[in-house]
From Swiss-Prot:
Essential for recycling GMP and indirectly, cGMP. The lineage of its organism: Bacteria, Pseudomonadati, Pseudomonadota, Gammaproteobacteria, Alteromonadales. Keywords: ATP-binding, Cytoplasm, Kinase, Nucleotide-binding, Transferase. Signal peptide: none annotated. Coiled coil: none annotated. It is found in: Cytoplasm. Pfam families: Guanylate_kin. GO terms for molecular function: ATP binding; guanylate kinase activity. This is Guanylate kinase.
Length: 207
């Protein structure tokens, strides 16, 4: 019997390395893991593929999906809507595939409200100085924008206590190993093993 997959909520302030960690986890395209593909009303950027990077829909379609209670969570960001499909995630989990949601603390709260068993992982930078260095090192933003991003990061980090696991991304390889350890540990819980090893357990206990 295939054990149900786990839903992992991964949140972090900008610059903490969340996207890089998720990309590294999925680099070899493991059959038992995938990142959730969100719906959005924003226009596709160059190189983005519908169904791979996002499900691109118009505002009317998105609002219809809201009315149908089709999203685990949704939000409006800078005039564009983003949402996580309830049906797609449920279907994927029943196939024994772990799903990763790359969302902020507000989205995490919405998901936890409807799926309390979802596992929250928060990625932190090792220090404020290092976070600012990473944000500045991108060389793409003005000091005003960096200051705004730092303030937003502090606000995001204030919600770390709402998560089940905390990873400090001081060394990338160590942080990646920590992430893999969390995933492995969740697959070895009693509930997961009862499903995965049901036939063996019944055989062991047969009179």
């Amino acid at each position: 019997m295939t054990a149900r997959g786990n839903l992992f909520i991964v949140s972090a302030p900008s610059g903490a390395g969340k996207s890089s960690l998720i990309s590294a986890l999925l680099k070899d395209k493991p059959a038992d893991m995938q990142v959730s593909v969100s719906h959005t009303t924003r226009a596709p950027r160059p190189g983005e593929v519908n169904g791979q990077h996002y499900h691109f829909v118009n505002v009317e379609e998105f609002k219809a999906l809201i009315e149908q209670n089709a999203f685990f969570e949704w939000a409006e960001v800078f005039g564009n809507y983003y949402g996580t499909s309830r049906h797609v995630i449920e279907h994927t989990l029943t196939q024994g595939i772990d799903v990763f949601l790359d969302i902020d603390w507000q989205g995490a709260q919405q998901v936890k409200a409807v799926m309390p068993e979802a596992i929250g992982v928060f990625i932190l930078p090792p220090s404020r100085d290092e976070l600012e260095r990473r944000l500045t090192g991108r060389g793409q933003d003005s000091q005003e924008v960096i200051a705004s991003r730092m303030a937003q990061a502090v606000s995001e980090m204030s919600h770390y206590k709402e998560y089940d696991f905390i990873i400090v991304n001081d060394d990338f390889d160590t942080a990646l190993a920590d992430m893999r350890a969390i995933i492995r540990s969740q697959r070895l819980t009693g509930a997961s093993q009862i499903h995965a090893q049901n036939d063996m357990l019944n055989d062991l206990l047969a009179g």
